[in-house]
Amino acid sequence: MASRIADSLFAFTGPQQCLPRAPKLASARLSPGVYAVRPIDLLLKGTRRTFLVPAKKRIGCIKAVFVPVAPPSADNAEDREQLAESYGFKQIGQDLPDNVTLKDIMDTLPKEVFEIDDVKAWKSVLISVTSYALGLFMIAKAPWYLLPLAWAWTGTAVTGFFVIGHDCAHKSFSKNKLVEDIVGTLAFLPLVYPYEPWRFKHDRHHAKTNMLVHDTAWQPVPPEEFDSSPVLRKAIIFGYGPIRPWLSIAHWVNWHFNLRKFRPSEVNRVKISLACVFAFMAVGWPLIIYKVGVLGWVKFWLMPWLGYHFWMSTFTMVHHTAPHIPFKPADEWNAAQAQLNGTVHCDYPSWIEILCHDINVHIPHHISPRIPSYNLRAAHQSIQENWGKYTNLATWNWRLMKTIMTVCHVYDKEENYIPFDRLAPEESQPITFLKKAMPDYAA
């Protein structure tokens, strides 16, 4: 769920080293009849559509520097293991056969994983409320030099509120829809996130996961967007480089507050959510400032909120972004391949997984969003038993993040992504900095 943009490839310990190109698993260059969302609109103006020019007809406003490395094959286990090591993965899955459907995969899941348990659902709420309250207590009592740790805990804890609202939106929290709407709205309020607008857009992410142009989460940067102007190019490079772990803020602003982005049947519910968010801001923020001042507002609300957006950006990037995971145009898109092959399971430190209610156990969630968060691990185990050879597995590590942030950038049919510094090396100082500054080891 971050703005439509790219990610990155990686594997540099110095400026002369180059990561092996991603294999051509199932990618596709856009045809002249496809429209795309402009990344700059996500950052500044809102969604507009622009006609994609075929790559061969693009104006050569930047000098491309191509590294003549033959793309490796991923047809056998040894090659996939090599790619996994290069990208920071534990496993890169085999291609799912074209004749396998999403229903085929779903039918192998135990029926119990779809069952809603009210006790477990409200236990999740208790965990989030308690951990968030503990975080606020730590912020209040911590000396200045321990505040970053308190903010990290509290930002992670409040991310749990988002996951609870996420379950409500997918009808996997309660059998009572009114309860889900109320809990979802309240859970999103500390994040000043409008529940219904997010729910409508997120449903489209699930319906069109990794579909070029149409997925409402992360997208590769369209080549013609990157070529359009030097100023825009620098903004894109910086936005998808150093500040990328907070770029979900741009997605939050762009997608959820403009009534024109919603269908007429959705507008009334969107207005209710917006009214709740604005009421929280109008009452909650002045109250915080009255009690602890503007610096207190920064200390108790803004910093944990930025911590939440770090996780929002990181989780959503890692879920669907890797050099070997393609985005496809609608006429080539396959639902089962997108949801199983195109989703990543990533293990994080246990305390993060607990506070965030296993949002990282993401493959079963894309097989069926109706699986409650507390049943995701059982569903994942079933998927590993029946479809494990097709899954992408990782443990959160520096190499994985370095790959995403320094390589998965501009859309390309053959390679899936082309890094910024291969297209505009003289303007890619932020990417060069990340390659030098980010450690290159995998846990």
Swiss-Prot record:
One of its GO terms (molecular function) is acyl-lipid (n+3)-(Z)-desaturase (ferredoxin) activity. One of its GO terms (biological process) is unsaturated fatty acid biosynthetic process. A motif (Histidine box-3) lies at residues 362-366. The histidine box domains may contain the active site and/or be involved in metal ion binding. It is found in: Plastid, Chloroplast membrane. This is Omega-6 fatty acid desaturase, chloroplastic. The keyword Chloroplast applies. It comes from Brassica napus. A motif (Histidine box-2) lies at residues 202-206. InterPro entries: FA_desaturase_dom, Fatty_acid_desaturase.
